[in-house]
């Protein structure tokens, strides 16, 4: 079994790497105590070995100075790996985390050096979760806790170790049993077999997705991300992301962030905290590398830090509003012709034809007043090409005018006007929205 293989892999690694072995052994003796934040029972872990991550300098200048510790050529000779094949040829190396927070703590690094980004990689995270179904996997956004924002990676830990994961599992099971009383999960939207909920506990900006298929999960996930503001200069919203496979479905939690560190990190006063919340912290396992801070922390103090790094209430409401309202659509005429040749990329069926006949559209052996092919993903920020039109004229009136095949995101609508077919690109628009 894959799960047994992971445990054996970790054991093999620790047997040949003293640094990692000592840190995993020390993990058994870390001090832990419990507090409550936003109604969720959370854990404080006094873990001095994590100071290297908590205090990491993450400016572009500092990152450029150091060698990337996730690149193969810079790894210690003692470090071994398992290979994992992602979608569309993406390759990952499964590694043991030498500075663990959890037992069997893994890092899953892209085999090639590339920036931390969830675009095109969430589906790989789901594949990991299904293949290694005893593990939960998480992703720190580049400004949301990743200590190597210049090299894409996930992390993996045994399921059931994180309070947020356990609480959400509990309430999802109650929902599936139609027991919704006093449930902090409120339903928002669906996409085929994928369903999205708002988790009204712990902190703001927590959303939960469940789906039987990775395809539906990915569509709804990117739709959710598309509803969040993007900080100026950043490629994606600030998030912590978690996924696991249980009871025949994928479960995903998205925690939207406002910042990586709260003012406590920079304070030189008595409220200083050497804490840089990442996925573990935002799932209820707070890593405290300084003993006096571990002993002094209270629920109120910790709650202040969590709220400061989470999205504000008004941003949470904007995300929900964008998710649940009807999006305005823009119809853009692309070309007209007696006959259209087009491809719908999602089905891989190749080129197909439509032509005018008796004032209607002849397509696939039948007559239609209109053809409409939905976009697989209605989002704008993460939209991908969904169809191809053949023979689109570009450069009209210029010396370089020519026809070429062009790809478009959004939906394709075909209508008849003046006895010619008109291809229309239907795209969603967001009024009055900008980077923040």
Residue ranges and their predicted role:
Residues 1-125, 135, 142, 147, ...:
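Active-site microenvironments that recognize anionic phosphate/pyrophosphate groups
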Residues 150:
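Histidine-centered nuclease catalytic patch
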């Amino acid at each position: 079994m894959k799960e047994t293989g992971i445990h054996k892999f970790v054991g093999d690694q620790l047997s040949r790497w003293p640094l990692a072995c000592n840190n995993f052994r020390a993990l058994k003796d870390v001090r832990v105590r419990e507090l409550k934040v936003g109604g969720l029972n959370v854990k404080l872990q006094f873990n001095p070995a994590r100071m290297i991550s908590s205090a990491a300098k993450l400016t572009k200048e500092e990152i450029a100075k150091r060698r990337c510790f996730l690149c193969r050529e810079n790894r210690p000779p003692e470090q071994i790996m398992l290979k994992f094949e992602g979608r569309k040829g993406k390759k990952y190396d499964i590694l043991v985390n030498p500075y663990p927070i959890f037992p069997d703590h893994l890092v899953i690094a892209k085999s090639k050096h590339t920036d931390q980004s969830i675009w095109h990689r969430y589906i790989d995270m789901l594949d990991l979760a299904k293949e290694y179904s005893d593990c939960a996997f998480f992703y720190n956004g580049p400004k949301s806790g990743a200590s190597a924002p210049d090299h894409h990676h996930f992390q993996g830990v045994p399921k059931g170790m994180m309070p947020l994961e356990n609480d959400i599992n509990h309430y999802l099971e109650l929902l599936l049993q139609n027991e919704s009383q006093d449930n902090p999960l409120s339903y928002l939207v669906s996409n085929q077999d994928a369903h999205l909920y708002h988790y009204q506990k712990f902190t703001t900006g927590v959303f939960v997705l469940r789906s039987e298929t990775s395809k539906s999960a990915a569509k709804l996930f990117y739709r959710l991300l598309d509803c969040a503001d993007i900080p100026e200069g950043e490629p994606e919203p600030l998030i912590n992301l978690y996924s696991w496979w249980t009871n025949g479905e994928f479960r995903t939690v998205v925690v939207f962030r406002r910042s990586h560190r709260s003012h406590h990190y920079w304070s030189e006063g008595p409220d200083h905290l050497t804490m840089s919340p990442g996925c573990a912290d935002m799932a209820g396992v707070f890593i405290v590398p300084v003993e006096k801070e571990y002993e002094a922390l209270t629920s109120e103090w910790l709650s202040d830090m969590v709220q400061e790094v989470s999205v504000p209430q008004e941003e949470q409401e904007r995300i929900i509003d964008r998710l649940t309202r009807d999006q305005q659509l823009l119809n853009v005429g692309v070309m007209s012709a007696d006959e259209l040749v087009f491809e719908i990329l999602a089905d891989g069926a190749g080129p197909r034809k439509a032509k005018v006949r008796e004032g209607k559209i002849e397509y696939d052996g039948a007559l239609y007043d209109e053809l409409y092919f939905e976009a697989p993903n209605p989002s704008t920020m993460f939209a991908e090409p969904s169809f191809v039109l053949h023979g689109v004229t570009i450069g009209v009136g210029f010396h370089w005018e020519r026809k070429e095949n062009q790809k478009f995101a959004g939906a394709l609508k075909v209508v008849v006007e003046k006895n010619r077919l008109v291809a229309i690109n239907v795209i969603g628009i967001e009024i009055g929205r900008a980077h923040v």
